[in-house]
Amino acid sequence: MRRAMTDNDHHLHSLALAAFEQLHTAMLGVVDMFTHESQVTTALLGVLAQRTPITTLVGNFDITSERASLTAALDGYETHRRHARVALWRVMLAEGCSIGEISRIFGLSRQLVSRQLRDIP
């Protein structure tokens, strides 16, 4: 027999839903970033295929800004992915799942699961 959801269960589910919505938004940002990076790489491949000098082209390109944007997008994705995973674990714990079972399901050590549950708000 399934137990009724408590207020805490509803709260944990709401937190997990919000975390996965943020993860989804971050994923879309990474998709946009990789689409842009792919376009830049395609253009660079065309220049390289023609064996034309690329020093001036690359010198006029703001590589630092591109790298910073890519790093920020990937960092945001990774942060939201970690938060979503921990929110899901909290729901699983509330449903009676043990840390050992969570670690087996996700292929992680119990120590890592415990530490992330403790350290990630």
Regions found by a protein language model. Give the residues of each.
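General nucleic-acid-binding
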Residues: 1-62
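Generic, well-ordered alpha-helical segments
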Residues: 58, 62-65, 81, 94
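Short alpha-helical "recognition helix" segments of helix-turn-helix
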Residues: 98-108, 113
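Short, amphipathic alpha-helical "recognition" segments used to contact nucleic acids or chromatin
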Residues: 81-97
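DNA major-groove recognition helix of helix-turn-helix
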Residues: 106, 117-121
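Short, Lys/Arg-enriched N-terminal segment that forms or immediately precedes the first helix
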Residues: 64-78
